[in-house]
């Protein structure tokens, strides 16, 4: 079938920014956390409640905790090197999931977290330092691969999988496995990271990515054993539909962040049932993040299936336009994938915490 360019009208309108990516949006993260809340053993639930509700927080469960790692993106580094939590007056809706952490002590925790994890690695996606902590949300393994492996391009010691492993170690009371460009100061911080990153891990475009030449053809970074910057799509953030809404760019990555609207931001009975049907993970918990990343990478194959890419007009470096073999089929497939991945994320978050606190 001839490919046609389709406007993704159902996308969330966002600007193209490598640091703006937020798997599932806060609603999806809350769904993952809510599913896990339903599947915790009594022992794990008691630990979660105790850890999350120390200090100035009350009534925090995994559902409310899950957006925390996106809330810290409101922490801004100023030219004098100081960090401040700043509310965007033009986008007060960004603060909706962050209200459980409005107390001064919790705001200070976010500022402290960003400050400690700003320069532990260098992250300059647009030529400016954006803070190492922003790399904790993703890996960019080429979809030509069938497994997650540290030898592949698009992985690094501070990617999503490495960060999850570090948080697991902290909750287990063990040293963070080297190399360790992380500063996770306590179990509360580790649990806040896990509650969020287990959602990120199951968003296909936070693990798998396509690398493209200027004409939109797939390239393989593992052939040359290096990533050419001009081929990076930033997990689909640089793949647009060519339609601007309110002067903002629509892109493929953010479509995948947008969950089906009927799900709301809680655990539906259907998703909980699906989560209960997720097979248990074999082996030790320390091995699970890599196995789960492999599973998500294979799902990313399906997320990119039926898509084509072509250069923008006029051509722009590191920007492409998505095309579809069949738009409606793609919508239906992506909807089903999202539901399945949200269920997996919640099931595996609970499985992990249940294993830690047996």
Report residues per predicted region.
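N-terminal domain-start interaction segment
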Residues: 200
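Bacterial N-terminal signal peptides that target proteins for export
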Residues: 1-9
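N-terminal, motif-rich segments that launch catalysis or mediate targeting to/interaction with membranes
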Residues: 22-195, 204-358
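N-terminal export/membrane-targeting signals
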Residues: 12-15
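N-terminal signal peptide c-region/cleavage motif recognized by signal peptidases
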Residues: 18-20
């Amino acid at each position: 079938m001839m490919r046609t360019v389709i406007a993704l009208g159902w996308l969330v309108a966002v600007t193209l920014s490598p640091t703006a990516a937020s798997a599932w949006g806060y609603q999806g993260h809350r769904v993952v956390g809510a599913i896990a809340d339903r599947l915790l053993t009594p022992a794990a639930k008691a630990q979660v409640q105790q850890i999350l509700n120390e200090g100035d927080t009350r009534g925090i469960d995994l559902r409310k905790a899950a957006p925390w790692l996106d809330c810290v993106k409101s922490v801004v580094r100023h030219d004098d090197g100081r960090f401040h939590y700043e509310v965007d007056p033009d986008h007060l809706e960004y603060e909706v999931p962050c209200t459980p952490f409005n107390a001064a002590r919790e705001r200070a925790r976010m500022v402290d977290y960003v400050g400690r994890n700003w320069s532990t690695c260098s992250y300059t996606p647009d030529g400016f330092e954006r803070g190492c902590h922003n790399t904790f949300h993703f890996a960019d393994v080429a979809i030509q691969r069938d497994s997650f492996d540290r030898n592949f391009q698009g992985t690094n010691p501070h990617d999503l999988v490495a960060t999850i492993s570090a948080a697991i170690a902290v909750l287990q009371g063990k040293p963070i496995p080297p190399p360790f460009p992380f500063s996770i100061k306590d179990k509360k911080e580790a649990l806040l990271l896990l509650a969020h990153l287990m959602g990120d891990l199951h968003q296909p475009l936070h693990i798998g990515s396509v690398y493209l030449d200027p004409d939109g053809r797939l390239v393989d970074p593992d052939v040359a054993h290096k990533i050419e910057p001009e081929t990076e799509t930033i997990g689909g953030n640089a793949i647009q539909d060519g339609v601007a809404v309110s002067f903002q760019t629509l892109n493929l990555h953010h479509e995948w962040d947008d969950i089906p609207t009927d799900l709301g931001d809680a655990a539906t009975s259907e998703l909980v049932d699906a989560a209960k049907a997720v097979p248990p993970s074999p082996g030790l918990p320390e091995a699970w993040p890599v196995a789960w990343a492999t599973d998500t990478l294979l799902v990313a194959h399906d997320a990119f299936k039926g898509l084509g890419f072509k250069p923008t007009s006029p051509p722009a470096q590191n920007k492409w336009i998505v095309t579809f073999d069949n738009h409606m089929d793609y919508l239906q497939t992506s909807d089903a994938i999202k539901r399945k991945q949200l269920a997996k994320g919640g099931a595996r978050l609970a499985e992990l915490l249940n294993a830690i606190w047996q």
